[in-house]
Amino acid sequence: MDVDRVHVDELSPEMIKVRDYVPEYAVIAHRGSTFWTPEETESAYRWAREIGADYLECDMQVSKDGVVLALHDDNLKRTTNIETVFGETLPREIRKNYYMKIGYSETEAEEKVKADEANFVPNLPAYYTYEELLMLDAGSWFNNENLEEALPGLAKEKQYISTLEDLIMYSKGYRLIRDRNQPGMPRQYSIVGKTGETITSLSGTADIVKYDFGYEIDPVWEAGNKNIPGIYIEFKEPWLNPKGFEQIVYDVLANTQDMNIIEKPEPEDTPFYINNGTINVGNTNGKVILQTFSLESLVRVAEVFQGKVPMCFLLWKGTGATDLTYDDPLGYASFINLGVKYKAHFIGPCIAGAPNDYPELDQPWQDYLIHRAKMKNHPYTFDTYDQMAKYFGQYNFGVADGMFNPPYLDALFTNHSDMSINYMITHGWRKSPASQTLVDAREVLRKLGYLDNN
């Protein structure tokens, strides 16, 4: 069946309105950056904000005590020093002191620790309190594995596993308050106490605990363009997070910097760019985009957010339960139709090419099908100039006629926001009022202090 004959459902006018909350050709900083910085840390998100990305992207998980994390891996070994800090066992004394700190007697705390030990799985984030996760270093691995891009500043300024609240605050021009006179410059935080609610996840049922985190205006942001990017946040597979996780995220957005536009919408005429190119996406109704690969998560997000917040249905070709198995027009259209049915505004297909060599799900005819549904196309993940040139149509994609016109995207996830922004400015795709100034990744790292040996 050809692409003109296959049936695709279309977004309603109401859904199109929400779709258009998002700027055209938005640059989405995938995990902040996986190339220049340790992913999903303060350094990554400060860099992406200052380089001029339109969105800061993260994956979401949750700690044992209900703190929403900005964290990709479900095994902490790759991006932290957990093997050195905790090994394969539950940190018994730390956990016991934590329970006493939030109001349990010593006897009660001991019983709770025994129950936790009986159900403990090492290295999985859901089995650790956020206080325990704060003891991990989420930045040193980057220097060990990336000698050419190593950042001397990480040796003096410890990088933490970020929270969703952290991500929001970075997007608003803040940085962590740190004790800059202590080794590692530890972040400021306190445990307020139990909220009275519980959370049931892989690690069992636990108290939700309120933390108070310290933030301050970032002097680099204040001296610069004062960019306010949006955030693009991913719901992982439902087995990884607790039932009701979508509502937890809804509430965090509502209670942090007015990020939930259902609760507090912005004026519809708020511009995406101001003051000669300053990013202002984070002050518009496009300030948050939701995303997921999981059909089950897509359904749950639709129930909670009702299609009133921009949403992307991500595609992967494979044999998993909700993977795209057949990438012919009929199979591809079936996933587009699921996206329309469950209130997604965008499709996010993977792209081919080094270094990831993902399957190709953003061929010209596939982009055409997405647009037939009146959805828009947010492919992932751009790493090279060659990929930018290919999907923006700079060279022939193998299309013999003029039916499928480039570019084959409406926004893009990138690990190199600097490269993507510079390509788009140079080739006329990033137009005024967005900034027309080419960016330098290392200069931004220098301003942030991450190239400083002192």
What positions do the PLM features span?
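Phosphate-group recognition and catalysis centered on beta-loop-alpha active-site segments
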Residues: 1-454
